[in-house]
Amino acid sequence: MVNDTVANMITSIRNANVIEATTVRIPATNTTKDVGKILLQEGFITNLREHKENTRSFLILTLKYRGRKKKPYITNLKRISKPGLRIYSNHREIPKVLGGMGIVILSTSSGIVTDREARQKQIGGEILCYVW
């Protein structure tokens, strides 16, 4: 069993982008569902659905590509806060990825949100990952 579900999700998406796969199947947890919803809202993926197989449930992410050469919309994902070294930030010190072109996904007391939402609500939290 994987302990760091967010890192597993990020690695699966990164690997799928390299081989130009259209879908990715990852184990469903509350955290991965919320991160997937954010990726869908921000336009990095086209579809997110939950699939149950026996007693386990999985998330099926449909990745988004552009052009004939199938360039992925997700250029890179980077895990920031890890189980061995948690990284926290208040709302004033949330970093901007590529000058605002990418997003920061945070785990806050209000749930998992993007950097823009956290600044609007003036809440800080644990920086889960960068997406650009």
Curated annotation (Swiss-Prot):
Cellular compartments per GO CC: chloroplast; ribonucleoprotein complex; ribosome
Coiled coil (residue ranges): none
Keyword RNA-binding among UniProt keywords: yes
Assembly and interaction partners: Part of the 30S ribosomal subunit.
Lineage, broadest ranks: Eukaryota, Viridiplantae, Streptophyta, Embryophyta, Tracheophyta
Pfam families linked: Ribosomal_S8 (PF00410)
Task performed by this protein: One of the primary rRNA binding proteins, it binds directly to 16S rRNA central domain where it helps coordinate assembly of the platform of the 30S subunit.
Gene source species: Angiopteris evecta
Keywords associated with the record: Chloroplast, Plastid, Ribonucleoprotein, Ribosomal protein, RNA-binding, rRNA-binding
InterPro entries cross-referenced by the UniProt entry: Ribosomal_uS8, Ribosomal_uS8_CS, Ribosomal_uS8_sf
Biological process (GO), any one: translation
Primary location: plastid
Family membership: Belongs to the universal ribosomal protein uS8 family.
PROSITE patterns per record: RIBOSOMAL_S8 (PS00053)
Protein name in the entry: Small ribosomal subunit protein uS8c
Localisation: Plastid, Chloroplast
GO molecular function, one term: structural constituent of ribosome
